[in-house]
Amino acid sequence: MKLTCVVIVAVLFLTACQLITADDSRSTQRHRALRSTTKLSMSTRCKPPGSKCSPSMRDCCTTCISYTKRCRKYYN
C-alpha cells in the first residue's frame, strides 16, 4: 500500500514538472523547424526557383512547371 502511494505521488510530481517546464518554454524556441521544402533545398543540390529545368530530371528544389520549363517559386 505504501509503495503504491509513493509511486502515485512520484508520477504526479513528474507530470507536474513536465507541465511547468512546458509552459516556461513557450515562445523561446530559437531555431524553429524548417519547412520541408527548405530542408530539401538545404540537403540536396537543386536548382533555385525561376531556373530552367526539365520535368523528367527532378532537378528543382520545388517542382518544375512543364509548360514554362522553370522551377516553381516558393509560396509563403
From Swiss-Prot:
C.moncuri is a vermivorous cone snail. It comes from Conus moncuri (Sea snail). Disulfide bonds join C46-C61, C53-C64, C60-C71. It is found in: Secreted. Expressed by the venom duct. Residues 1-22 form the signal peptide. The keyword Transport does not apply. Residues 23-45 form a propeptide. One of its GO terms (cellular component) is extracellular region. GO terms for molecular function: calcium channel regulator activity; ion channel inhibitor activity; toxin activity. This is Omega-conotoxin MoVIA. The modification Hydroxyproline is found at P49, P55. The presence of a 'disulfide through disulfide knot' structurally defines this protein as a knottin. The cysteine framework is VI/VII (C-C-CC-C-C).
